[in-house]
A protein has these predicted regions:
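Terminal low-complexity/charged segments
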Residues: 1-182
Length: 182
């Protein structure tokens, strides 16, 4: 099914929602959905028989700084029934970086939303467990934001070259040879 046909089936199955087709460099149809429409669109994507996107395969974000809205949250959905994929993008402004969780619709979103929160600072309202996932609890900031400072908090450990004399080396070789003979 081509991109236009998927967009038409979305508009027919979920009337009243303004889907915006997005350019795609691969074979997956890509549409933008507004942050306000996501709570009503997500269950319809899963439950409507003409769509049946039962699997959330990927959930990630992109920091488009300095552009506004700064972030895009990207969902890749799979319909096994119709044998197709759909990429949903939701624009999220930096000043109000949050959107509703979809973890009750697609349980796979649970840890993926935590990862996006941890690395980009985009909060998911209603998430059952909004703790950090990858970074330590005392970590300040969000490391995948383009304006995140790149800094080293402690000096890196550099191994020093081992200083061995020829006599020590020969003794170790002889010891290893005798040990192998048993």
């Amino acid at each position: 099914m081509d991109h236009d046909a998927i967009l038409a089936s979305l508009q027919q199955a979920i009337p009243g929602v303004p889907f915006e087709a997005a350019p795609s460099v691969d074979l997956h149809a890509t549409v933008f959905v507004s942050r306000d429409d996501l709570p009503s669109v997500a269950p319809a994507l899963r439950d409507h028989p003409d769509l049946a996107f039962a699997l959330l395969a990927e959930l990630t974000a992109a920091d488009l700084w300095p552009r506004e809205p700064r972030f895009e949250v990207i969902y890749v959905l799979v319909s096994f029934v119709h044998r197709r994929r759909l990429r949903i993008k939701v624009r999220v402004p930096a000043a109000d970086a949050h959107l509703d969780t979809v973890s009750e619709i697609w349980p796979a979103a649970n840890w993926l939303e935590r990862e996006v929160w941890d690395l980009f600072g985009i909060a998911f309202d209603g998430h059952p467990d909004p703790r950090r996932l990858l970074m330590p609890e005392d970590w300040e900031g969000f490391p995948l934001r383009k304006d995140s400072p790149v800094q080293i908090r402690r000096p890196p450990h550099v191994a020093e070259a081992l200083q061995v004399t020829e006599e020590e080396f020969a003794a170790n070789v002889e010891r290893d040879r005798l040990t192998r003979r048993g």
